[in-house]
Structures are given as C-alpha cells and as structure tokens.
Design a protein with these regions (language model features):
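Asp-based, Mg2+/Mn2+-dependent phosphohydrolase catalytic module
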Residues: 2-9, 14-33, 44-69, 76-273, ...
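A cross-taxon signal for low-complexity, glycine/charged-rich
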Residues: 274-290, 295-297, 301-305
Length: 305
C-alpha cells in the first residue's frame, strides 16, 4: 500500500512569510514521485485557492485548490452530512463563509440551527447576536479548538477556540469542535487523499509540528505521525505526553531523499537519538491511566523583537 501524506502548514512548510528550508524540495519530491498529499490546516479564514496562491508567492508552484483541506471545509462537510437543511449564524471571515455558501447552507441571524465560529470578525455586536441565538436554541459549533492564531513573529490574535470559549462561558452551553484533532477532520482528509490517489487506498501519515492537534489527531485516527521540530514543539516537550509521534524529524527536508528513493532514513528516528535527548526511554514516554491526562493547551510562540 502506497503512503500518502497529510501535511500541516504553519511551522511545517512556512513560518510567517518564509518557507522553511527544504520545504519546496519536499513538495517537489512528492509531486515528481506521484505521492498523494493533502495540506491540512485548522485556519478557517483562507480558502484553498488563497492557500495555493500563498504557497506560489513563497516559491512552491503547481498546486491547486484540491491539495488543501481546511477546518472551514470540514465544517461545511459536517453540516452537509449531518444536517443538510440547517441554517447558521457565522462569526468568521473568508474561507468559512465561502465553504458554507458553496454548500448552500443559509444564513439566519434570528433563529439559526447553529452558531458557527471561525477565525476573525468576533465583534461585540456579533458575539451578542450569537449569544442570543444560542439562548434561543442554536447549537454552538467551532471550526477548530485553537485559542490563538499567529499574525507575525511578535503578534497573535484570538482563534476560533477562544471565541467559542467566550460563548460557552456566557451561555453555559458546550461547543462541538471540528478541525484537528477531531476524528471527523481526519476521516474526511483520508477520503480526500484517496480521491487524489484516484481511488487507491493509502497508508496515511500526518506530518505536523503540534502535539495537541496534529499528533493527537493522528493517534486517535490510527495514523502514523511525523513530528517536525521546525515549528511550535521542542524535543524536550515530548516527555509531557503519553501519545507519541511515530517519528521525529528536524524538518520536512529530512524526508526528501526518502521520498525520492523509497528508502526510509533512520537518522532522526533512532532510539539512541531519543534516549540521549530525554530521560525515561523513548521520547520520555510515561505510563498514565488516562491516556490524555497530560494534554496541555497549545504553547504560545516565543515573541521576538
């Protein structure tokens, strides 16, 4: 069975407005080798077309909208599948509005079936309207659980998770969170990966930089996971988690030769490497009754001046 890759973007392919070294070669190797791949992001604001254009401007060419799957698309898929005649009141911008419109899911600011929360547009007026809608019976749905989104090296902004948490606190209702690490995101992404491979089953591998979303989601979905250290996670953090990545890489550059030759590299995956770095065995794995007892909020990025 051929391997197909689900790939996070921020911290894996780029940081801010710069490609991570080796990322362009990695994508080129996937394309040249005919390896199926799908970029997977929790950011609900951009459309797939936006993301393809952004990567083109950064130096990665030849991609189309079909290579991207966002939490906005995942939310639209979820509603279309579970409640196709529903109506929504949306706090969000760009991608989530487009995805819902394309699925012909109607807006209703009075008595919607759902309040859908994405990135951006969380004004006091919108939050108040959403609060009233929920009090009237609307269910609360968040495109993803991320509390913050990076804007630049020294700036972040509230994410969908933070906005949903605000409404949870004000209404006493619990939100349902889509996007990574929700299994529905990975279920749909695997379907998309199979479509890209012209119907051939794929052995899915998730490549990401975040333990709480990328690696946990892959673990729960039964997928292999490759953690890259080019983003938000440092190697010494792995001891805080029971669920562990299948492999740890410095960046996706470590996979280029492997994809070209079909032969795995053990440079970053050897037990000796892990045991030298962390106490307690392979990646400092601990035994806990509750598998996710050590789950922590996603760490904020280091701010630079």
């Amino acid at each position: 069975m051929k391997t197909g890759y689900l790939i996070d973007m921020d911290g894996v392919i780029y940081r801010e407005n710069h490609l991570i070294p080796g990322a362009a070669d990695f994508v080129q190797a996937l394309t040249t080798n005919g390896t199926p791949f799908l970029f997977l992001t929790n950011n609900s604001a951009p459309t797939p077309e936006d993301l393809a254009v952004r990567l083109k401007h950064l130096g990665i060419h030849g991609l189309s909208a079909r290579h991207f799957y966002t939490s906005a698309l995942n939310t639209a898929d979820f509603l279309s599948e579970t409640d196709p005649s529903c109506t929504v009141f949306v706090i969000g911008e760009g991608g989530i509005l487009t995805a819902l419109h394309e699925r012909k899911i109607a807006n209703d600011a009075i008595r919607p079936s759902y309040v859908v929360v994405g990135e951006g547009a969380a004004t006091t007026e919108k939050l108040t309207k959403a609060h009233v809608c929920i009090e009237r019976g609307a269910r609360l749905l968040a495109t993803n659980p991320d509390n913050w989104c990076p804007v630049s090296s020294d700036k972040t902004r509230p994410g969908a998770g933070a906005t949903a948490a605000f409404l949870e606190a004000s209404t006493g209702r619990r939100a349902y969170y889509l996007g990574k690490p929700n299994g529905y995101m990975f279920h749909r992404a695997r379907q998309k990966l199979t479509e890209l491979a012209l119907g051939q089953p794929q052995q899915g591998v998730m490549i990401g930089d975040t333990m709480e979303t990328d690696i946990r989601g892959a673990f729960e979905a039964g997928l292999q996971s490759f953690l890259v250290l080019s983003g938000s996670t440092r190697l010494e953090m792995l001891g805080d988690y029971v669920y562990q990545p299948t492999r740890v890489l410095q960046s996706v550059a470590d996979l280029v030769a492997e994809i070209k030759t079909g032969k795995p590299s053990d440079r970053m995956n050897s037990p000796a490497f892990a045991e030298r770095t962390l106490p307690g065995g392979r990646f400092g794995q601990r035994h806990q009754t509750d598998v996710f007892a050590l789950h922590k909020p996603r760490p904020r990025p280091a701010m630079t001046k």
